[in-house]
From Swiss-Prot:
Pfam families cross-referenced by the UniProt entry: tRNA-synt_1b (PF00579)
UniProt xrefs under InterPro entries: aa-tRNA-synth_Ic (IPR002305), Rossmann-like_a/b/a_fold (IPR014729), Trp-tRNA-ligase (IPR002306), Trp-tRNA-ligase_bac-type (IPR024109), Trp-tRNA_synthetase (IPR050203)
Originating species: Chlamydia caviae (strain ATCC VR-813 / DSM 19441 / 03DC25 / GPIC)
Protein name, per record: Tryptophan--tRNA ligase
Localization, UniProt: Cytoplasm
Lineage: Bacteria, Pseudomonadati, Chlamydiota, Chlamydiia, Chlamydiales
Entry's Gene Ontology cellular component terms: cytosol
Reactions catalysed: tRNA(Trp) + L-tryptophan + ATP = L-tryptophyl-tRNA(Trp) + AMP + diphosphate + H(+)
Length: 345
């Protein structure tokens, strides 16, 4: 019988999750979780949060954000009985493996990763102000992946370079000390991102262009009403552009009535329909889609013990796996092995 392939993915706890997370990662995670060929590990990467959020009030907020992420995950169907959900900072071995891996990769190699500068820009970090922690973010990510001996990592195109770095680190370690780590492969879903409601790049909290999984009906209606469409379409009788229009991107994803969507597109191109009619239907479909998630989320937040137990169970699973991996690393590396055995600590 073939052994299950181990999958690792997760989120930084920076707040509530939004439709961009659903489209870019969560839907794919559910498919993987419910496929018997995969063994899924989902990491709440709180240490990664510190790479761009180091102020005291930001660090204090992480605790609450962990509850937010947990509630969102479980409300959409992530199942702690099928997958291991764990807290990154609760795994001591991650710190050690991160340090060891940092000896195996050059600064030039790290600085060649395109997304690093983008992260600094999004965090309003000026050039030259990059912290050692942020610069080492991709190495910490490699430690997450290889500590779990993950074989598959679902990522967007902007993170493919991170996985290539992880493969480089695995190859370097295996060549120098012995074969321990698999070289993980990337796994991409049909869609890796969702344009924000302002039409200016992908949906994100920092851009203030997100519809959250927990938004109430009135908030959804308001955000859809303000959604960016074709700027050249001043009147309903003006033929509009469908391609690249956020309004139709969302309809294609969230409106199950494909005949209706195609009719909207035809009438829009002909200048025979008002934006408000299309937006009203989109709001209705988003409300229908998100309502069960929102209700389940509220129930979970009202019973935090369920969230705690889910995280406890998964973190214990990851702790056991981490200990096994690091025992292999210590035996292979033979770092001060004789002295370590003599010390009674």
């Amino acid at each position: 019988m073939n052994k299950k392939k181990r999958v690792l993915t997760g989120d930084r706890p920076t707040g509530k999750l939004h439709l961009g997370h659903w489209v870019g990662s969560i839907k794919n995670r559910l498919d993987l979780q419910n496929n018997p060929a995969y063994d899924c590990f989902f990491i709440i990467a709180d240490l990664h949060t510190l790479t761009t959020r180091v102020r005291k009030e930001q660090v204090v907020d992480v605790d609450n954000h962990i509850y937010e992420v947990l509630a969102d995950w479980l409300s959409v169907g992530i199942d702690p009985n099928k997958s291991s959900i764990y807290l990154q900072s609760a795994i001591p071995e991650i710190y050690e493996l991160h340090l060891l891996f940092s000896m195996l990769i050059s600064v030039n190699r790290i600085m060649g990763i395109p997304s690093l500068k983008e992260m600094a820009k999004n965090a309003s970090i000026e050039e030259g102000g990059l912290s050692l922690g942020l610069m080492g973010y991709p190495v910490l990510q490699s430690a997450d992946i290889l500590l779990a001996k993950a074989q598959l990592v679902p990522v967007g195109k902007d993170n493919e370079a991170h996985i290539e770095l992880t493969r480089d680190i695995a190859r370097n370690f295996n060549r120098l000390y012995g074969e321990i780590f698999p070289e993980p492969e990337t796994l991409q879903g049909e869609l890796t991102s969702l344009v924000g409601i302002d039409g200016q790049g992908k949906m994100s909290k920092s851009a203030n262009n997100a519809i959250y999984l927990s938004d109430d009906d009135a908030t959804i209606e308001d955000k859809v009403r303000r959604m960016y469409t074709d700027p050249n379409r001043i009147h309903a009788s003006t033929p509009g552009r469908v391609e690249g229009n956020p309004l139709f991107i969302y309809h294609d994803i969230f409106n199950p009535n494909k005949e209706e969507v195609e009719e909207f597109k035809t009438r829009y191109r002909q200048g025979c329909i008002k934006d408000v009619e299309i937006k009203t239907r989109l709001a209705e479909e988003l409300i229908r889609f998100l309502q069960p998630f929102r209700e389940k989320r509220a129930e979970l937040l009202a019973h935090p013990k369920i969230l705690q137990e889910a995280l406890q169970k998964g973190t214990e699973n990851m702790c056991a796996l981490a200990k096994e991996t690091m025992e292999e690393v210590h035996n292979t590396l033979e770092l001060s092995r004789k002295w370590r055995s003599r010390l009674s600590l």
